[in-house]
């Protein structure tokens, strides 16, 4: 498997967002600024709450097939690879990791089978597009910790994806969960979210390496990044952390993570989080405390790193 140097683009972008020329300009700027060789495009469907069994990807709040194709067209025009990623968010704001149902059947209560039927339908829809556009990798889900134990249902979902998509298939488990997923064997690639503390990268990488060795699968970080807030280098996964603005925090974390990647050549890809379709002004970058790297020092670190490895 070739190394994927990806950046996530357009998370939670609505239907029709690519009709705004500035959105696709942002995508081009992403490739130019970071040197990434892969577009990682997340299509985030919606369900009402963590106990809902109906998933909606047709709403105006979710990017359309037309949007997906427009983004892929830009990537191909620039000679880039493509990862399509299925996600689901809860409309009430609860994190998708809390999606969960009773393991024992209870009349009148929501059922695992109903949720997986809806989520499988969504995946088949997106996997068909992935096949048609020739995506190099398809990711069937993201950080769905509450669902991870339902191995048989996940195996069924992956089997349906493979009926319509012939490329590599993965699942993006949450940080610290790599060893808890028992069904990596039905996938081609193990992937996870790499929001690990700056002072614990060696330990976490070694732990993950053991999982990859056990299953004899390639591994990549489907997500990783760090906000620009004091303390975020130790809890980069916490998007709600209220530390004071500190651009250097992100810079230090990225430098450490890039060095760790170079020291662990068994890792075969990374997906940086994230790049917005609606960018903040460049002259306001040093006032932005979020995960974005646009016009921040971390952007230059990524570009230099990708150039060093001949990807930019």
Regions found by a protein language model. Give the residues of each.
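Distinct, well-ordered alpha-helical segments
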Residues: 20, 95-96, 149-158, 173-189
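The substrate-binding groove and active-site-proximal loops of carbohydrate-active enzymes
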Residues: 10-17, 52-65, 105-120, 141-148, ...
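Aromatic- and glycine-enriched glycan-recognition loops and surfaces
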Residues: 16-33, 56-77
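Substrate-binding cleft and catalytic face of glycoside hydrolase catalytic domains
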Residues: 34-53, 66-147, 276-278
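Short, acidic/polar
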Residues: 16-32, 116-129, 174-183, 251-260
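Glycoside hydrolase catalytic-domain groove-lining segments
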Residues: 63-65, 70-71, 77-81, 85, ...
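Aromatic-rich peripheral "rim/lid" segments of glycoside hydrolase catalytic domains that contact
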Residues: 18, 264-312
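Active-site neighborhood of glycoside hydrolase catalytic domains
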Residues: 121-122, 137, 144-172
């Amino acid at each position: 498997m070739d190394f994927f140097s990806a950046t996530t683009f357009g998370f939670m972008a609505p239907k029709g967002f690519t009709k705004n020329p500035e959105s696709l300009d942002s995508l081009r700027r992403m490739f130019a600024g970071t040197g990434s060789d892969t577009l990682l495009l997340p299509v985030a469907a919606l369900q009402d709450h963590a106990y809902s069994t109906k998933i909606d990807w047709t709403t105006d709040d979710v990017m359309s097939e037309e949007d997906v194709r427009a983004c892929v067209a830009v990537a191909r025009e620039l000679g880039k690879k493509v990862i399509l990623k299925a996600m689901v968010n809860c409309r009430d704001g609860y994190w998708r990791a809390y999606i969960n149902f009773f393991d024992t059947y209870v009349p009148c209560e929501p059922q695992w089978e109903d949720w997986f039927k809806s989520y499988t339908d969504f995946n088949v829809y997106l996997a068909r597009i992935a096949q048609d556009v020739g995506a190099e990798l398809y990711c069937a889900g993201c950080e769905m910790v509450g669902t991870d134990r339902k191995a048989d249902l996940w195996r069924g979902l992956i089997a349906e994806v493979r009926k319509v998509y012939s490329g590599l298939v993965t699942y993006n488990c949450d940080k610290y969960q790599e060893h808890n997923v028992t069904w990596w064997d039905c996938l081609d690639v193990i992937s996870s979210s790499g929001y690990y503390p700056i002072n614990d990268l060696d330990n976490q990488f070694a732990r993950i390496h053991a999982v990859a060795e056990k299953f004899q699968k390639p591994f990549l970080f489907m997500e990783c990044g760090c906000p620009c807030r004091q303390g975020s280098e130790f809890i980069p996964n916490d998007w709600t952390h209220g530390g004071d603005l500190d651009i250097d925090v992100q810079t230090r974390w990225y430098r450490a993570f890039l060095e760790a990647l170079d020291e662990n050549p068994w890792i075969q890809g990374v997906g940086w989080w994230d790049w917005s379709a609606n960018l903040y002004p460049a002259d306001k970058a040093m006032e932005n405390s979020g995960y974005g790297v646009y016009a921040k020092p971390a952007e230059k670190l990524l570009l230099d790193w990708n150039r060093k490895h001949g990807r930019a």
